[in-house]
Amino acid sequence: MYLKHNLLTLTDKESFIHGEKVNVAVVYADLRGFAQWSLTSTPSQITRVIEVVYDRVIQLAFFYKHTFHKFLGDGFVLIWEEKDHGTLADALHWALAAAFEIHKRYWYIAERLQFPSPLGFGIGIACGEVVRIDPETFIPELNDPDFVGYPMNCGARLQKLAGPYGTVLDSRGVDIAMKNPERVLRTTNEILRLELFKPHNKAISMAHTFTGLQEDDIFGFCYVTWPYVKNSLWNVDGRV
C-alpha cells in the first residue's frame, strides 16, 4: 500500500488473523532483463510495459480461473486453490495453461511495440500445501489475504532458473504431471501438448545455491515447453 495518498481507517474492532491449510498451484512470472532495460528506457516506455503486465493478469482472471493474484512490480504471482478445481492436477492444468498464454501474448505484444522491450517472462510453478492468511485487523485497508509456505518460496526461487519464455516446474508438479499426462500435459492434443525436460548440470548447480530449496526440487524440477508454439513463434525454451 502506498501511504502517501491513502489514509488508514482505525476502528474499534479487535484484530484476528485466521489461517487455513490449502493445496495450491502457484505461478511466479517475472520479466527477464527488466531492471537493466529500464535504465535506458523512457517513463512512457516503462509504463507501457507495466500496462502489459496488468493487462495479462486481468485477462487471466477472466479466462484461467485463478483464485488469487498479486502484482510484484514487473511481475506477478497467481494462485489456484485445489478446492476450487477439484484436484491439484486440475489446478496445475490451469496454471500451465496460463503460463503459456502469458508467453504467447507477450511475444505478440513485444513484436508490435514501437521500441525495444524486455526479453520475455520467466515463470516458476510450484505445487503443494500452504497456509492462506485471512487477516481481520482494526485497520480495514490492511485486510488483504496472503499465502505462506514452502511452495511459495519454491516457486519464487525456481522462477530464477527460467530464461525468457521459459517455464520451470517443481518436483511435486512434475510428479502430478507424469501421473495425469492427459489433463496436465495435454498429451492427446498434438497442437496443445506440453513436454517436460530434465535440467542440465548448470541449472542444477544454480538451484543448489538457492537458500531454502529442498533437495527434491534441486534435482527434481523440470523445464516445460510447448513444442508447437515454440517452433511457430520463438526459438528458445528458457533453459539457463
Which positions does each model-derived feature cover?
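Catalytic NTP-binding/metal-coordinating core of nucleotidyl cyclase/transferase enzymes
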Residues: 10-94
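Intrinsically disordered, glycine/charged-rich C-terminal tails and inter-domain linkers
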Residues: 1-12, 131, 139, 143, ...
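Amphipathic alpha-helical transducer elements in NTP-driven molecular machines
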Residues: 96-99, 148-155
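Substrate-engagement module of ASCE P-loop NTPases
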Residues: 56-59, 101, 106, 154-160
